[in-house]
Regions:
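Active-site neighborhoods and metal-handling regions in enzymes and metal-associated proteins
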Residues: 1-238
């Protein structure tokens, strides 16, 4: 008998349950690749989910624009309002992950999380990073955007523009069959690199259909990944 395992993911206890007479082969899970290539029904659900998420975000941004000058907005109220507007949409199930709302320097902290004990008030100046998403019963969303909530320095304007150029390059890229995410990743960074700027985290990742918001095996990042981007895969551009 033969058992397939993914050595980088299986824990020691589970591995030890495999009978000693079995032949163990360490390979990537074939289920991951099959799951990553969404069928027509799943893709339709994703599009519906994105439309609903878009409606919620438009309402949120309208609220944010009016609320920031009042001095009553904090990183925590940003989380609450996003949840409120998304919950008004049909088939809403919950957040796909805990919202990251980082004002000014907090926006540079990867996977930052505001707490009641430690959070910032959002003033009408600088940038507010919002990384958030929702689970709808017909699809999952994950969107990262950085919003100008007031006056910006010239340095911030330039950096923002270079990031936007990279986002557009990924969104409009046309590439041949067999292209890997690591090959596309440079498109997101070129404008930044041309100006001696860089970011150390990934650019995008696979997204599950009403499942894990982070789903492999594909991604878009500097580190080499042998998995090619294929039709049906849903991958974020962050």
């Amino acid at each position: 008998e033969t058992v397939l395992v993914t050595g980088s993911k299986i824990n020691r206890t589970l591995l030890q349950t495999i009978p000693t007479h079995c032949s163990v082969i360490d390979v990537p899970s074939p289920a991951d690749l099959m799951k990553s290539k969404k069928n027509k029904t799943e893709l339709k659900g994703f599009r519906n989910a994105m439309l609903k998420d878009g409606k919620a975000l438009v309402k949120f941004y309208m609220w944010l624009e009016k609320a920031v000058p009042t001095g009553e907005v904090t990183e925590l109220t940003v989380e609450e309002k996003l949840r409120e507007f998304r919950s008004q949409q049909p088939l809403y199930f919950g957040e796909s992950f805990s919202t990251i709302a980082g004002y000014k320097g907090n926006g540079a902290i990867v996977h930052y999380r505001a707490t009641p004990e430690s959070h910032l008030k959002v003033d009408p100046e600088g940038l507010l990073l919002i990384d958030s998403g929702a689970q709808f019963m017909d699809g999952t969303t994950d969107i990262t955007r950085t919003v100008a909530v007031g006056a910006l320095t010239d340095q911030i304007k330039l950096a923002y523009t270079h990031v936007m150029k990279g986002h557009i390059q990924i969104a409009t890229a046309i590439y041949p069959q067999g292209t890997r995410g690591s090959q596309l990743d440079v498109l997101a960074r070129k404008a930044l690199w041309d100006n001696c700027l860089h970011y150390s985290h990934g650019t995008g990742h696979g997204i599950g259909h009403f499942l894990n918001v982070h789903e492999g095996p594909q991604n878009i990042r500097l580190e080499e990944n042998p998995v090619a981007l294929q039709p049906g895969m849903v991958t974020s551009n962050e």
